[in-house]
Amino acid sequence: MFEFRNTRSTQSERQALRHKENPYISQPLRSCLEAQSAENQRNKMIRNISICLAFACLTVVTAFGQQDPQMTQWFNDLAAFNIGAAGNDDLTHVNIWYRDQWSGVNGAPVTTMLNAHTKVDFVPGAFGLQLYQDEIGQESNTMVKLGYAYHLPTLTNGAHIGIGLNVSLFSKSFDANWIAVDDWQSDPAIPQTNGSGTSTDIDFGVFMRKSNEYYAGLSMTHVAEVQMTSLNIIPTRHYYFMGGYNYPLNGEELILRSNVLAKTDLNATALDVNVNVLWNNFLWGGLTWRQGDAVAPSAGIQYRLSKKEGITSSEQVFKVGASFDVTTSELNSYTPGTAEVFVSWAFKFLTTPVENKYANPRFL
């Protein structure tokens, strides 16, 4: 979910009230698009959009910073968006995303993210680790998160509840080499030299799941809203609500899975609704609708491998998924869409202790 707020945008904000507001397009970007709407040459338009993206990234006087990364296949790893979901099964999970947003537009967001979490035996819960790198225009964002989810005792109906907390280190940097679209030197919001800053923050999440039947969760990111050092930027608090339900259509062979994710910073709200079908616990395909932004078909495979040899046993699950967001916003004339790839490895290796037996020679 990418949104940039510029405190100096007054006339453009009033103009936007006459149109349907798209929470995925910043106000400076929208203003630039409208100003260039009379252009007929496609190549010029793409260049202008790229300039607008760079401008939007840098207008940050007492503004909220870069939003959290957006992923279409978020339902493949709920713990990436709610630390309370970490360790909701007995496997260790390692998941990687790559997302190329608005393909073909120079300076558009490119996001890489790794999320790992594992259940442990020495405490009632799980630990998580998340790394992500986000590049957009002349702006670069890096986040490192370490988290723990405490698992409450299983409820009488078989549901499990996790309460989690992330501690994060957030780094942001700007490159001053950019193309201005107006008299930028008179605007103190725009840095004239390269700049960078860091901040620490926390995330919080509560998650409930009943086996493979349903789940629900509520989480917050940037809870502390700590201003970044050397930059006049405050990452804004985000709220996430997620929920899902699985409907068996043909026993366990065919399962209809529904997922919903609502994201808001109490000013702009975005909604993701996904429906997909899992066949034979191996092949899945579905469709995601994102409010005011895109329709995204997605598909993937998952393969489970169980093995036992002597005193050792293992269980592994491999997943690969891909999606393509077909843009439905104002950018649909300038980009074919957004490509995303998801890869996951979940595993558990066990060694059964050898039972020592003692015999009395008298009874041999």
Residue ranges and their predicted role:
Residues 1-8, 12-68, 346-364:
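Cleavable N-terminal export/targeting peptides
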Residues 66-364:
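Subset of outer-membrane beta-barrel
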